[in-house]
Each structure stands twice: as structure tokens, then as C-alpha cells.
Swiss-Prot record:
GO terms for molecular function: rRNA (guanine-N7-)-methyltransferase activity. It comes from Burkholderia ambifaria (strain ATCC BAA-244 / DSM 16087 / CCUG 44356 / LMG 19182 / AMMD) (Burkholderia cepacia (strain AMMD)). The gene is rsmG. Specifically methylates the N7 position of guanine in position 527 of 16S rRNA. Its main location: cytoplasm. Keywords: Cytoplasm, Methyltransferase, rRNA processing, S-adenosyl-L-methionine, Transferase. It comes from the Bacteria. SUPFAM superfamilies: S-adenosyl-L-methionine-dependent methyltransferases. Pfam families: GidB (PF02527). Its EC number is 2.1.1.170. This is Ribosomal RNA small subunit methyltransferase G.
Amino acid sequence: MTARRAPAVNRDVLEQMLVDGTAALDIALTDAQRNQLLDYVALLGKWNAVYNLTAIRDPKQMLIQHILDSLSIVPHLRDRASARVLDVGSGGGLPGIVLAIVRPDWQVTLNDIVQKKSAFQTQMRAELKLANLSVVTGRVELLQPGVDVPEKFDMIVSRAFADLSDFVKLARHLVAPGGSIWAMKGVHPDDEIARLPEGSRVKQTMRLAVPMLDAERHLIEVIVDEAN
């Protein structure tokens, strides 16, 4: 049985979708950044069967549900310059690779426990020429600043990693003073917020509007005592 091939889509079509989507999000991209994002979509499609990166195979839907979805958090993080960012459970590199492309002033680290996915992330670092991107394999709760990663992080993000309370428990030791944890969620996670561990609280909740996607999305910022 042969694998189902992804439908072919003209790059110009994807580029126009990206132009329209970033305009709706009020994100200005250089030509180089736009090409990096389009190259990333192409590479996701090319290597998906090998690395099992995503169930989405249509390039248009990859652009919407992966790239624009990841970009939707950028306007809410605009004031954070020269940040150290950890993307937990990054998988195919989302949202971390997208953040590294559009914010070259950030140092972004991708984390996953699956070596095969870390290998893909490392390949993307080389192919997309992302000098501000690094990759670390292993369980986030076992990562130690100064050993596995250079230091603690200003922002720890996840897109599809775990229950919010579990995410906070596992990653809180990596939050730098003044930093916070950011979780991308679908429907508002009231039950998960109610289970947040002691010493953590929601600082703000933002409703995300993802262009061309009719689905509920939220961004939750959590602060922890250790980071204050």
C-alpha cells in the first residue's frame, strides 16, 4: 500500500495566502522571512512521511493550521526583545521554528523527547539557515540550566504539549526571573486552569484570531513564584 501523496499546490498560491494572513495579523515580513516560511512548509511536506510530523498533508492547510496558527501569537509578544525562548514538545518545530524566523533577535530552543523529530529540527536549522535556533532532546522536567541548556528562559511556549497544569509542573524550573509560561490552546481551558499547581497563576488570557481558520484559539500566560 503506497502512502497518500500530498496535493500539489503552486508556491505562488501559498505565498499569497501568507501575505494575506500576515497582513491580517499585522505582521511585517521581509522577503527572506516569507521565503523561509514557504520553504519550511515545503520541507514539512517533503519529510512528513519519514519523520511522522503532522497528520495534515495539504500544503494550504499546513500554511493555515501550522504557520498562521503559530504566527497568531507573535503580535502578543511584540514587546519582548532579545528573548530566550524554549518550545516544549516542539514536534515538527511548531511554533518554535516560525518564531525563530520572524524574530531573529530571539534565541529559540526546540525540545522534544523523540530523537527522530529532533533530527528533523536540526535539519531545518541547517536548511533554513537559522543561526538563532538550537535543539535539545529529552524530557523537559530533566533539563538543567547550565548543563542541558545554557540558562533559564524568558518564555517557555507549547502548542500541543500537555494539560496546562502538567506543562507548568514540568517546565517551571526553567523559567528565568521575570519570565513566564505561554500555552497555546483551543477552547478556553477552564478545567486545566483550575488545576494549576500551587505557586502559579494565570497572568492573562488572549483570544487568538487565526486567519482563514474557523476555530477557537487561546493563548494563556502563566507566571510562577520561582520566576518572580
